[in-house]
Amino acid sequence: MLNVVILAAGLGKRMQSDLPKVLHTLAGQPMLGHVLESARDLQPGRIVVVVGHGAERVEAAYAGQAGLSFALQRPQHGTGHAVQQAVPQLMEGDGAEDATLVLYGDVPLVQPETLRRLMAARGQGVAVLTEVLPDATGYGRIVRDAQGQVTRIVEHKDANEQERAIKEVNTGILVAPTAKLKDWLTRIDNNNAQGEYYLTDIIALAVADGVTVSAAQPAASWETLGVNSRAQQAELERRWQAELARRQLEAGVTLADPARFDQRGTLECGRDVYIDVGCVFEGRVKLGDGVRVGPHCVLRDVEVGAGTQIEAYSHLQQARVGDEARVGPYARLRPGADLGNQAHVGNFVEIKNAVLGEASKANHLAYIGDADIGARVNVGAGTITCNYDGVNKHRTIIEDDAFIGSDTQLVAPVRVGRGATLAAGTTLTRDAPADSLTLSRIRQSTVPGWKRPVKKS
C-alpha cells in the first residue's frame, strides 16, 4: 500500500502574509487541499503532512480527516530533513514494505494521472517527476549517464557551468521504497551551498546501491508550478482557470469568454448550457440541460433545473431552482431558497429559507424570508414578510393561487388562504381567509380647496 508525504512546513516569506503559505487559496480552496485531493485519488494507506510554520493553523484546517496525520519539522533544515520527520509514522505496521510518494503543499495542481504515470515508471525502484524547461534557472538539474539513466540531481546553487546547461529539471516530486528511503535519509549530509539536507541527494545513493532511478513527465507544465509569491499565485490561478474552462468547453458548455470564467469548486453541466462573461461558480454547482447564466452572476452550492435562465448580476447561495424558472436580473437567493418549476424571481428580490411554488412570481422589489408559498401565487412589488420579532424567526404561509398586492407587509406568523387576495398597502397581522379580499388601510379622503403652505417672506 502507498504512503504519501506532503511537505507543508515552509514559511512563505514572499507571500507577505500571516497565513501559512499552504492555506492560501487557489480556485476556492487552500493549496494543500488540492494536493490532498490528488493524493487521495491514489487511495494511499496513509498521508503524513509535514508542518512547521503555522503548524497549529494547518493542523486545525484538516484535523480529523481519515488516514491523515501530521509530523512537525521545527526548525527547518531542508526537504530531506522534512521527510525524516515523517519516517516514524511511515514505518508503523507494515509501512516499511510500502512505497512512499513525496509531494509539496505549495505545488497544488499535480494531477492524479501524472502521479499514476510516475508510479508506473518506478517499477521496484525510484522514480522522479522531471520537466524540460527552456530556462532552468533556479531548478535542480537531472544528471544522466551516457546510457540516459538518471544518476543524480544537483541543485542550481551547487551546479557547475556544464550542469547548469542541462534543461531537464527536478520538480521535487518522487516515489521510493519506504525502507530504502529511510536508510538513504540517514546517509545524506548538509555539505552544500544552503547548508541543508536535500531530499534529492537520495538519488545518488540509490544509484550507488544499484537501485534503478526512472523519470516521468507531467502532461502539462502548469502541474508542477509552485507558489512562492502573490504574483505566482495569481499566475497559477489563471492557468488553472483556463484549464477548467477548456474542460467545460470540451464537455459541451458554451462560455461567452473562457478568459472571464471562474470555477472555484465543482461545476456539473447538462447539455447546451450557456455561461456569459464574469460568472463565478463556488462549492458544488449543478446546472441542468439548457440553463443560461447571464453576465456577472455568482452561484455557490446551487442546483438549477433544466431550461432555467439566471439573468445578469444575480447571486445564488445554497439554493435550488426548478425547471424553466426565471431568476433576476439583480436577484438574490440566500440559503434555503427553493424555487419550483416555472417560478419567476425578478429584479431586487431577496429570498431566504423560503419555498416559492410552481409558476409563482415575485417580479419586483420584495423580501421573502421564512415562508412557504404555494403554486401560481403573485407576489406584488414591495412585499415584505416580516419574519423576525427581534428574537425569533416566524414563518409565513401563502397557499395556492393567492394574490399579494403591492406594498404589503405580512407580519409572521400568518397564513394566507387558497385563492385569497391581499389589497395593495395591506399590513397583515392575522390570517387571511381563502377566496376573500383582505385589506387594512384607512379610507381615502379628499380635502377640497386645500392649499400648500407658502414660504414666509
From Swiss-Prot:
Residues 231-251 are annotated as: Linker. The lineage of its organism: Bacteria, Pseudomonadati, Pseudomonadota, Betaproteobacteria, Burkholderiales. Signal peptide: none annotated. This is Bifunctional protein GlmU. In the N-terminal section; belongs to the N-acetylglucosamine-1-phosphate uridyltransferase family. In the C-terminal section; belongs to the transferase hexapeptide repeat family. One of its GO terms (biological process) is cell wall organization. Gene3D superfamilies: Hexapeptide repeat proteins (2.160.10.10), Spore Coat Polysaccharide Biosynthesis Protein SpsA, Chain A (3.90.550.10). Keywords: Acyltransferase, Cell shape, Cell wall biogenesis/degradation, Cytoplasm, Magnesium, Metal-binding, Multifunctional enzyme, Nucleotidyltransferase, Peptidoglycan synthesis, Repeat, Transferase. Disulfide bonds: none annotated. Its cofactor is Mg(2+). Its EC number is 2.7.7.23, 2.3.1.157. Mg(2+) binds at D106, N228. It comes from the Bacteria.
